[in-house]
């Protein structure tokens, strides 16, 4: 042996410069917390637990019927991921429509014709008014739009999903969403920077129509946001809110520890829902990880990253596809 040192010691030497830069640029406590992970020699790495059969396509009977309920994939200037979102809902048996806010403002498309509404991620208006705030105000302070959204939310046969920027936007509209009065606002990450990671999350038991049958599942998901901290100082009630998703560490425990929890929310909270389950918002991006080929890492049991065809385990789909199929089953 020419050279021999413990892996943790070499890792700390390698990461020291990055730690110093991060401590100057971002939250120094988070910089130290990430650096200290090198001291955990027993870290098992990401541990996945799927509490359902991901090979079962529960939406198949509804797809076979030929009926395709309409879902609006809503976006605003600066949004993204609408293509991945539309693809996932299309595969789950919906007719996914690309809807820009100008389509609603001009009357080209009506929410009254939709059964589902999905607000996608991104950075509407560059987040200059606060993440999702400008988008929400476009709705709140326009009589045509506020009436249309209130009517849509008030119908008993509709659902809505907000992801990332859409989560921030819908949280800012909590006052007009039935059952969302306990939702927080989502504000700047504790790390004081934009976080783009593959993070481990647990899906707790909840009434969310999107998460039915998934309770107890722990899976990786894409994260990409700068303002994901669940902030109850501005609105909401941490004691009453219904969790739909939370960050966990590599031992499966809900955590506030950085970087397992990239935004620092108490109890790992990163997704909430309503008591009837029709409305759910979350900061992570399930639409970006619905297939093996979209994953930067996945368990070998899911198939290799380049196995995306029908011969791959689960047909090339990850367990996240169940979220979209659940919505189709709920519509019936």
Where are these regions (language model features)?
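Short acidic loop-to-helix transition motifs that present clustered carboxylates
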Residues: 99-107
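Short helix-loop-beta junction
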Residues: 83-99
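Cysteine-nucleophile active-site neighborhood
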Residues: 120-208
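Residues that mark the start of a beta-strand
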Residues: 68-70, 95, 220
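Intein/HINT protein-splicing elements and their conserved insertion hotspots or analogous self-processing inserts
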Residues: 1-70, 78
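Amide-donor transfer/coupling interface in amidating biosynthetic enzymes
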Residues: 107-109, 146, 150-151, 183-332
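Generic beta-strand/beta-sheet core signal
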Residues: 74-76, 99, 117-120, 163, ...
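Short acidic/histidine-rich motifs immediately flanking catalytic phosphotransfer sites
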Residues: 110-118
């Amino acid at each position: 042996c020419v050279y021999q040192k413990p892996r943790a010691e070499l890792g700390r030497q390698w990461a020291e410069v990055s730690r110093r830069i991060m401590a100057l640029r971002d939250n120094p406590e988070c910089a130290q917390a990430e650096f200290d992970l090198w001291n955990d020699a027993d870290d098992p790495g990401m541990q996945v637990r799927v509490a359902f059969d991901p090979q079962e396509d529960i939406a198949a009977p509804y797809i076979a019927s030929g009926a395709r309920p309409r879902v609006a994939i809503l976006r605003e200037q600066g949004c993204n991921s609408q293509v991945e979102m539309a693809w996932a809902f299309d595969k789950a048996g919906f007719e996914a429509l690309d809807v820009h806010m100008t389509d609603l403002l001009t009357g080209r498309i009506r929410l009254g014709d939709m059964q589902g509404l999905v607000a996608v991620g991104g950075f509407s208006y560059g987040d200059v008014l606060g993440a999702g705030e400008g988008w929400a105000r476009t709705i709140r302070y326009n009589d045509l739009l506020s009436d249309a959204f209130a009517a849509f939310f008030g119908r008993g046969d509709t659902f809505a999903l907000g992801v990332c920027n859409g989560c921030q936007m819908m949280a800012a509209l909590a006052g007009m969403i039935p059952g969302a009065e306990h939702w927080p606002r989502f504000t700047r990450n504790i790390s004081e920077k934009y976080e783009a990671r593959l993070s481990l999350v647990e899906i707790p038991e909840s009434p969310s129509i999107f998460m039915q049958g998934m309770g107890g599942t722990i899976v990786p998901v894409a994260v990409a946001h700068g303002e994901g901290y669940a902030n109850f100082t501005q609105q909401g009630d941490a004691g009453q809110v219904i969790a739909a998703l939370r960050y966990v560490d590599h031992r499966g425990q809900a955590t506030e520890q950085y970087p397992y929890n990239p935004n620092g929310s108490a109890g790992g909270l990163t997704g909430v829902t309503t008591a009837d389950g029709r409305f759910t918002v979350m900061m992570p991006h399930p639409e970006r990880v619905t297939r093996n080929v979209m994953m930067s890492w996945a368990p070998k049991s899911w198939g290799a990253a380049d196995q995306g065809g029908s011969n791959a385990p689960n047909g090339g789909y990850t367990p996240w596809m169940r979220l979209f199929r659940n919505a189709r089953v709920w519509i019936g």
